[in-house]
Amino acid sequence: MTACGARRMSGIVNEKERRKRKSSVPAKSAGEYLVMAELLGRGFDAEFAGPGSRGHDLLVWSTDSSARPIQVRTVHSAPWYVRRSSFVGSRADQVTVYVLLGVERRVTSPRFFVVKNSELAGQFRQPPNWTAFGFIDAKMVEHYEDNWGILR
């Protein structure tokens, strides 16, 4: 290898070292599977919602209840970007599981925050120039970590 070729190769290696790699695991799919596993491990019955079901990702029920639709929102690092419409009307009573994978910060296990949308409606943050979207910070949902009892 020539000196010029070695310099080019070292430039490529240095560039790769400089760039931080993001996880190649799609957060949405990972979150849904993790929530499903957590629910089954806690004694719930659960199934993935069909492709035509809008507004929810899983159906969950305990032994004596009817199926309850839940939304799963997953990120590698907070905040979660959400629609304002998720917190009003019929969706206000829906339960959302916010999943924080934490891959970029070397967190070894995901964190689950289980909350009814209406409880976060007043904490939803929306920049002045945004109309339909806003975000939920990790501090807003900390109180609801592992709040699986809400689904019983």
State the predicted function of each range.
Residues 1-54, 59-152:
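Mixed-charge (Asp/Glu-Lys/Arg
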